[in-house]
């Protein structure tokens, strides 16, 4: 969409663009020429990385539920359930892994990054929670770079092997289930 002074029906836009919402992330940026990254994310996504974003992230769950798994300051995993119609503001620098199940849609808004402002994608062992791998990027294309980071991790058995407990994370990610 171009920068125009015109509204549009977001649900219609989602319906017309849902074929673009593909795993592992299932995201599509709405406007390319904005100072914000406003994107629709659909489910099911297939990711297990934790994103450490230098800016706040605003979540609005349009359809179904989204589960945002966060790492607390104490290093514990905590899941925030964002129900249909709910909003959630995730503070900057909180490691988080958004999980979406089938037939769900949400809007996420974050700001574009300043030059030199870096962020991380981090993988933790499913068995012992040890940090296994970290990728630091200057984010310029969220649709492309997140997928590349996930693919790089999933395709490399050496970095999927936990150096702490020996557990090997599977290459293929199952649809996330809230426990």
UniProtKB/Swiss-Prot annotation:
Catalyzed reaction equations: 3-hydroxyanthranilate + O2 = (2Z,4Z)-2-amino-3-carboxymuconate 6-semialdehyde
Keywords linked to the UniProt accession: Dioxygenase, Iron, Metal-binding, Oxidoreductase, Pyridine nucleotide biosynthesis
Function: Catalyzes the oxidative ring opening of 3-hydroxyanthranilate to 2-amino-3-carboxymuconate semialdehyde, which spontaneously cyclizes to quinolinate.
Homology family: Belongs to the 3-HAO family.
CDD domains documented for this protein: cupin_HAO
GO molecular function per UniProt: 3-hydroxyanthranilate 3,4-dioxygenase activity; ferrous iron binding
E.C. number(s) listed in UniProt: 1.13.11.6
Protein name (record): 3-hydroxyanthranilate 3,4-dioxygenase
Family annotation (SUPFAM superfamilies): RmlC-like cupins (SSF51182)
PANTHER family noted in UniProt: 3-HYDROXYANTHRANILATE 3,4-DIOXYGENASE (PTHR15497:SF1)
GO BP: any one term: anthranilate metabolic process
Cofactor entry: Fe(2+)
Annotated organism of origin: Bacillus cereus (strain ATCC 10987 / NRS 248)
HAMAP family for the chain: 3_HAO
Binding site for Fe cation 2: 125, 128, 162, 165
Residues noted as binding Fe cation 1 in the record, renumbered to the chain: 51, 57, 96
Residues the record lists as binding O2: 47
InterPro entries: 3hydroanth_dOase, RmlC-like_jellyroll, RmlC_Cupin_sf
Binding-site list for substrate: 57, 100, 110
Cofactor note: Binds 2 Fe(2+) ions per subunit.
Annotated Pfam families: 3-HAO
Keyword Membrane: no
């Amino acid at each position: 969409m171009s920068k125009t002074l015109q509204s549009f029906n977001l649900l219609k836009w989602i319906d017309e663009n849902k074929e673009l919402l593909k795993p592992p992330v299932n995201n599509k940026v709405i406007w390319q020429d904005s100072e914000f990254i406003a994107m629709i994310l659909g489910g099911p996504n297939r990711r297990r990385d934790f994103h450490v974003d230098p800016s706040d992230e605003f979540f609005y769950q349009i359809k179904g539920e989204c589960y945002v798994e966060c790492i607390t300051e104490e290093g514990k995993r905590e899941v925030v359930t964002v129900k249909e119609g709910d909003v959630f503001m995730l503070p900057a620098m909180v490691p988080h892994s958004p999980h979406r199940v089938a037939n769900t849609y949400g809007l996420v808004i974050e700001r574009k990054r300043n030059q030199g402002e870096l962020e991380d994608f981090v993988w933790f062992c499913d068995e012992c929670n040890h940090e296994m791998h970290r990728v630091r990027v200057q984010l310029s294309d969220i649709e492309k770079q997140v997928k590349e980071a996930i693919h790089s991790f999933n395709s490399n058995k050496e970095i999927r092997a936990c150096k702490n407990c020996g557990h090997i994370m599977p290459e293929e990610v199952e649809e996330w289930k809230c426990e």
